[in-house]
Amino acid sequence: MTSMASLFSFTSPAVKRLLGWKQGDEEEKWAEKAVDALVKKLKKKKGAMEELEKALSSPGQPSKCVTIPRSLDGRLQVSHRKGLPHVIYCRVWRWPDLQSHHELKPLDICEFPFGSKQKEVCINPYHYKRVESPVLPPVLVPRHNEFNPQHSLLVQFRNLSHNEPHMPQNATFPDSFHQPNNAPFPLSPNSPYPPSPASSTYPNSPASSGPGSPFQLPADTPPPAYMPPDDQMAPDNSQPMDTSSNMIPQTMPSISSRDVQPVAYEEPKHWCSIVYYELNNRVGEAFHASSTSVLVDGFTDPSNNKSRFCLGLLSNVNRNSTIENTRRHIGKGVHLYYVGGEVYAECLSDSSIFVQSRNCNFHHGFHPTTVCKIPSSCSLKIFNNQEFAQLLAQSVNHGFEAVYELTKMCTIRMSFVKGWGAEYHRQDVTSTPCWIEIHLHGPLQWLDKVLTQMGSPLNPISSVS
């Protein structure tokens, strides 16, 4: 019986050789099937197998592209699981913990990178590198409050909140996002934010992906955030930073190392927490995300998976028929990625998701409260740590209130199936049947440390306008 089983589970010598370079101990059968499928494709190309073995056996040496034909949807199916080919083979031979194509970037030597949309796609794992989180420069907080109260932006912030429409504006991805680089949507005249970097700092850096989004690579990492010139910087061992940004505050006084206290960004244990709501009722406990890839879906997975928040498990005695019906349509929900200091939301549900992210809206030049519709199979960058760092570095020079206002940027609201805003009959997110609130811990903790260093506000913050 054993001999019969081994007869039907025969592995070719070529597959065995390639599996010798496999990384990690998990998913042996899946990896074997993935390699077997690849060998069948490569055997049709002269020298392809040899080139792959050369790349795997000599990681530090130059190697050529190893290509396979691109499928219609760009994905490859291995044992009932579909994935992007370069991600699959990078996972097998280099990074077993790889979660998403957002984590990979092709090397310059690669002639057939996945993102180039050519008929052939390179699967050489040594033609890709893993995206690293950029190091954010510390925020320099003045030790003494030399800021002129007349320059306070508190009035502007209050005007902005007063001028906010009763209902948020709406934008649909990707239709509303194709704006000329030199003409973003106008901000409110009282907007506390500088012009959108989508049009100024790095105009050719798309922050989102089209309907084929799971098969597109993100843009290059944007330039570092603004820092004062070297002779104004606080610690002697600080790294030199780009000072060419056109977003430098014009009224910033000259500061010396004795006058400022640097506050550094620290990556928290849990990068975010997610809270689920039905109408205006919070349901269940908060989900704390430690994995950089998190699924929020409508199913019931009792296994307590740390990278999955199953809304189907949560009960609510006040649930009405509209909520029940909406929950049935959440399906695969949304996939959240935290990669290289950026947060992406990919809609896996058959129904659209609706996102209100002030950071995303700032980048695209939308009004801060705009709600963006993300259709099924699309992904959108909803937060960028480096843009946030730029805003924080500038806000420090405008006082406590300006920094405190940035807390709104660290919370992202997202509804499933049903939208809200000017184009929908629901005016507020609390009128949607099923929605989540995402709190970004890293930026929030950074703000907290900066505010603590700044001391008390010039004008007490209150709920009274």
UniProtKB/Swiss-Prot annotation:
CC terms in the record's Gene Ontology section: cytoplasm; cytosol; mitochondrion; nucleoplasm; nucleus; protein-containing complex; transcription regulator complex
UniProt-recorded name of the protein: Mothers against decapentaplegic homolog 5
Keywords annotated in UniProt: Acetylation, Angiogenesis, Cytoplasm, Developmental protein, Differentiation, DNA-binding, Metal-binding, Mitochondrion, Nucleus, Phosphoprotein, Transcription, Transcription regulation, Zinc
Location, primary (coarse class): cytoplasm
Modified residues (N-acetylthreonine): 2
Gene encoding the protein: Smad5
Entry comment describing in which tissues the protein is expressed: Predominantly expressed in mesenchyme and somites during embryogenesis, and present in many tissues of the adult.
Region (Disordered), start-end ranges: 163-251
Residue numbers binding Zn(2+): 65, 110, 122, 127
Domain MH2 positions: 271-465
Subcellular location(s) of the protein: Cytoplasm; Nucleus; Mitochondrion
InterPro entries: Dwarfin, MAD_homology1_Dwarfin-type, MAD_homology_MH1, SMAD-like_dom_sf, SMAD_dom_Dwarfin-type, SMAD_FHA_dom_sf, SMAD_MH1_sf
Function noted in UniProt: Transcriptional regulator that plays a role in various cellular processes including embryonic development, cell differentiation, angiogenesis and tissue homeostasis. Upon BMP ligand binding to their receptors at the cell surface, is phosphorylated by activated type I BMP receptors (BMPRIs) and associates with SMAD4 to form a heteromeric complex which translocates into the nucleus acting as transcription factor. In turn, the hetero-trimeric complex recognizes cis-regulatory elements containing Smad Binding Elements (SBEs) to modulate the outcome of the signaling network.
Record field: compositional bias (Pro residues): 186-197
